[in-house]
Amino acid sequence: MASNCEKMLSKIKIPLPDMLNAVLDLDSSAVIIDQIKNLIKICWSKEEMDRLRNSAGGDKEVLGKCEEIFGELMMVPRIEPKLRVFAFKVEYPSRVSDLKMWMHTIIAATKEITGSVKLFRIMQTSLTMQVLRGSNVECGLDSLVKLCDNVYLMHDFCKLLDFGNDLVHLEAASRIELETITNKMQELFDIEEEVNDEFLASENDGANFVGYRNVVHDFLCTIDGDKQLLNILYAEVGGLVNSYIAEYPSGVRFKEATNILTRFVETFYKSREEIERQAEAEKEILEKRKMNIKQNGNL
């Protein structure tokens, strides 16, 4: 246990008082988050500190460092919750930024999919083909990629060949799990609850911690404002996705639909390139034939 303490302490590169001041100011510019996480790991209880003393053996130097830092940490009321609030504050902007980006991407992709006239025409053709073959119309999404194997249809789609330009957010949306968004949203709500608990508990910390309470209060206001916006985006995502997925059989998930559409776009463009190569090859053959006929006619 003492050796573990030594390893953790070796990773803390700035004076502990400076670090604690940064924590109480929620000033992420002065401290590396990994150092805070290492401090959280050594916020032991009294019983754990007693075990540390017993396990230190003859290594008094290591034990002395651990006891010194432990003593300084314990001078701050509820030091571990305060360190956790600081860690939340450091990571919070990227958490919110990721959620906003993911939800804006899904919203944009869903609107592009449902608003693309060219994609609608291609889907209608796919469904018509299935009806003519006596297939289950509800499985149109699964058979969409097979359209690319039909050269004649691909020629008929010549006016639609750039339909992928309508779906600029599709590929990015296909990599996003709606479940991940839900889980990350819940994590933010849990963080808000933990920060609020620490804010309420800090009311009895005394005059030396008034500044700390003020910055935590400001942090809570930021969380509350972001939460309102994220809830609006989340509701919009849910409404758009549910409306779009309702067009398909039960059990089809949004990620499955976007993955199939992404594959279709990729396959469609590969088929288009193959058709263009074939057309170019046929053109060269025709030109050679014309050249041969012309040469034979001049003999």
Swiss-Prot record:
GO terms for molecular function: actin binding. Residues 1-295 form the FH2 domain. InterPro entries: FH2_Formin, FH2_Formin_sf, Formin_homology_domain. Transmembrane segments: none annotated. PROSITE patterns: FH2. It comes from the Eukaryota. Gene3D superfamilies: Formin, FH2 domain. Belongs to the formin-like family. Class-II subfamily. This is Formin-like protein 12. It comes from Arabidopsis thaliana (Mouse-ear cress). The gene is FH12.
